[in-house]
């Protein structure tokens, strides 16, 4: 089982999935629009799921904006400015006392489609997210392409 969290400008949505994709739990709260409260809310979400299912679980989080590969800072999260210039991956990993995989939401969307979505039979996948903001993700051979 794994926990997936979608951190957005308006909501934080969590899902607990079995390895076969079966959804066991889903929850949604409003984004607090404050960095430390975001860290605290996600930590509480994970702790509550783990308490309910009596397991320590892997956690993956998609977020708006990109991560500067040199500094680890989130940048260009235009509709979630409280995330900008923060080391989100480092901070949430520290708060949860484990390595948490964090990635741009559009990259996660494109990767998901490449593995088990409508693009699973294609070598190259480009996904666009239109929500509170707009973003794109490119996947080639089931690997996210990251660059400037």
Where are the predicted features?
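A cytosolic small-molecule/anion-sensing beta-strand core signal
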Residues: 18, 63, 140-141
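Short helix-terminating capping/connector loops at secondary-structure junctions
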Residues: 52-56
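Short glycine-rich, Thr/Ser-proximal phosphate-binding strand/loop in the N-terminal lobe
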Residues: 2-40, 73-74, 144, 148
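Glycine-rich phosphate-binding loop of actin/hexokinase-like ATP-binding domains
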Residues: 122-148
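Glycine-rich phosphate-binding loop and adjoining helix at the ATP-binding site
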Residues: 32, 36-43, 47, 57-59, ...
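Short glycine-rich anion-binding loops that position phosphate/pyrophosphate groups of nucleotides
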Residues: 64-67, 131-133
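Short glycine-aspartate micro-motif
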Residues: 2-6, 58-60, 125-129, 135
